[in-house]
Amino acid sequence: MLKSKYLFLSLICLLTSFRLHAQFMDYGSDPAKFKWNIARLPHYNLVYPQGNDSMAYRYALFLENVYPHMSKTIGKPIKAKFPVILHPGNMQSNGMVSWAPRRMELITTPSSDLNNQSWDKHLVLHESRHVFQTGKVMHGIFKPLYYIIGEQAAGVASFFLPVWFLEGDAVSTETAMSNGGRGRLPEFNMVYRAQMLGGKKNYSFDKWLMGSYKNYTGTYYALGFDMTSYARQRYGADIWDKSTSRYIRNLLFEGSFKHYTGSSFKRLQHDTFDFLRAEWEKQDTCTQSPQYLSPAKETYTSYRYPQPINDSIVIAVKSELKDINSLVIINNGREKHLDYIGSINSRLSYRHGRVYWSELVPGLRWTHQNYSIIKYYDLDKKNIKTLTPRQRYLSPAIDEQGQHIAVSRPTVEGKNQLVLIQAEKGNELAAFDVPDNAFIKELTFAGGDTIISIAVADSGIRLLQFNFGNGIWKELLKTASANITSPVWKDGKIFFESGANGTNNIYSLNPADGQVRRMTAARFGAFDPSFGSSDGRLFFSDYQADGYRIASLPTDSMLFEKADLNRPASMPFVETLAAQEQFNLDSARLTSVDFNPKRYRKAEHTFKIHSWAPFYYDVAEAMNSGASDLSTIVKPGATLMSQNTLNTAIMQAGWYIDKGYHHGKLSFIYQGWFPVINLSVDYGDKAFNVDWTQNDKGQDITQGHYTQRNLVEAEARVYLPFNLTHNQRIRGIQPALTYYFTNNKYQEYHSRKFHNFQYILPEILFYDYRRKAQRDILPRTGYQLRLQYLKTPFNSENYGSLYAARLTTYWPGIIRNHGLMIRVGYQYQDLDNKALYLPKHLLEKPRGYHFQYQTRQQWAFKADYALPLLSPDWSIGSLIYIRRLRANLFYDLSRNQASSKSRWSN
């Protein structure tokens, strides 16, 4: 009985928690032109665009070969097949496992931040672990819940599983079951290492987990990896299997862990960090004293990708908590802002007065169709220019003459290419396939027609040399485990960054003899090497507790210490994890899979019922509502939910009782075509009639009365969400057309005919605002403009048309991260020769005012001043953590004129 109460409490908490957004995530749709295949595998149904059979087979091969080994340290999931969808058109490399509906969504474009593990293997290992996690908890007391609420039961079952455990355990798995994984990278834990050894104070477990607006606290991926891995090292490989097995019997995850270990999660974090501190103190030696060019900051500020103009002037990308990314130029420690930039996804590259980089830009319409283009900043003209059309270009490298640009291009079909671009006009000159279809994550020119690239393939990470004059590839360096990145050519040698010795440092390779040497001895990490043009001074980004600083070393201060990249330093926990799993995807002999793809017809898979409930709640309302009163969201009734595999069709149907009346409600969204279609119908309550009569003075008046008809309200909306985001500006245009119908009948004044009330509402929305920094509450600058026109085509004797314009503007506040939002609106209703006012307003009422007033003309003014008050990072017990206290001061004014002969009123 007690467990049943806990289950009900979990379900209610789910409906009002942030987890609901993850539970019913709409991951976006692919271009309508895509045609799809499906491969039905033993444990997965793999759905992918036609033309990607080779890519899909690799995913099928890895998914099925990993599956038998994934349960060793977590337990077995439920037996139902898991849908997997590949999105090759998206450049924002990522993966996701969702609960309702159950699915794995994989963006197959490799990340330019990739380590020495191929992207498909990385995704399969990490996301497969999530499949097993959520599947494991669907046993025990949660198993019957599936029959009550469907696939959303997994969300309830996972409600008390902390995100650090889910993601940390998945990172542990990707590390243990391969030669790569983020757990093998020193930079993955660099934030904690720097704060413990070089920071002013250590933070609490709650602050590390929940984050801060005052300090940088890393990610729960790294925190979770450390905690889950330490627990496995100290308490055994099966500690999380045992803890989750007990959890599905008693609903207390931390209590289950404590049952086997005697430790709380806070104690686990404390013990983990004590262990790591002891390990890192053994390595805490720094034999170099570089010169710092960027100024020291009191708050976390980073300067990345330094490009020296000369030995005292450097251009870099600056990032901080209080502002968005920007280009800055630093001259002898004095910093000057150049311009704000967008979603940069590469290093900087400087040649002849121009600074180049690649940047992610969204597609016009589709979530899973976006691009990576080449841009540059012109130091003479002081502006940013877009060089290339919308393409899939990554990691630009510029030759010494500034005439050619070499880029990496992963195609939608899964082919990896090296592409040569003309630097002045951005047109493509040639494209070359990479040996073994290795993904090129970074490049540099090595003089003349020679290009050096860092490429990742199944065999590991390699340094390749390519001559585009004769088309010959040559392997310069091959390594299986140590990650290498950021190549630079200088005086016949290749310089790059690697964490081979347990700390990220700058290394060099002499192609003539194959000798690798370590050049720096950074305390926490040296990144982004580049060289001055005169004396060969090395510039790099040096990580410290308060962020990356730009440092430089003269040639005579470099180490030139011999190194072996084939024997990288062992990172904490890695050897233990690998021994526990006893499976390595990179070295295992893989068994072929039966791969027989069939056509996947979109029309036949429009609906996919995944969840239901013995009560009614509106998912959209629950996610958008801040209400604490559950009675406004949950009602007696029943709910049925559908979301198809391709995320093109989302439907919710329900029956509920409200105010004594039975209601049926249906909502349906289709986003598989260029316009998005949104339909909703609500059937229930009682409809009314409004008719004309005369009072005792002989005047025409209206009177309303309820009828025996059941009320029907329906709405159809079609809109086009055009995304025009550019640089740091979020931009778009959204034209829309809404048709509304209700069977409430209004009698026409002259003809005395009754008509259902209905209207059409064309509108258009323009928006343009600056991206928000982490500390921003409102955009710093920008606007939104909405123009609307409402007409009742079948009630023209009673009602005139309604026009409205609303302008929202954003302004900087008095202090950084304060924000001012001003909203101005005007509404006009055409009442000439009309009998009634429309029962519809397009302008929002003043806050706190709920009276339904009559209006011919209305002006509205609203002002909001949002400001942070305090960022205390306080924990109150184990349930409340306060990152920030903020205030919103507002003022509303509305002036209304009821008729042409009326006075204006406030």
Which stretches of residues belong to each language-model region?
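Feature captures outer-membrane beta-barrel proteins of Gram-negative bacteria and organelles
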Residues: 376, 508, 636-644, 662-683, ...
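Beta/coil-rich, acidic/histidine-enriched accessory regions frequently appended to metallopeptidases
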Residues: 27-28, 35-38, 215-218, 242-353, ...
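A flexible loop/linker signature enriched in serine peptidases of the S9 family
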Residues: 183, 300, 318-326, 339-345, ...
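Juxtacatalytic substrate-recognition/specificity segment
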Residues: 22-156, 162
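C-terminal outer-membrane beta-barrel translocator/porin domains of Gram-negative envelope proteins
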Residues: 681, 686, 692-694, 703-704, ...
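Transmembrane beta-strand segments that form the barrel wall of outer-membrane beta-barrel proteins
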Residues: 240, 389-390, 522, 605-659, ...
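Outer-membrane beta-barrel initiation region
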Residues: 289, 299, 498, 557-674, ...
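Acidic/His/Gly-enriched intrinsically disordered linker/tail segments
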Residues: 26-31, 101, 116-123, 131, ...
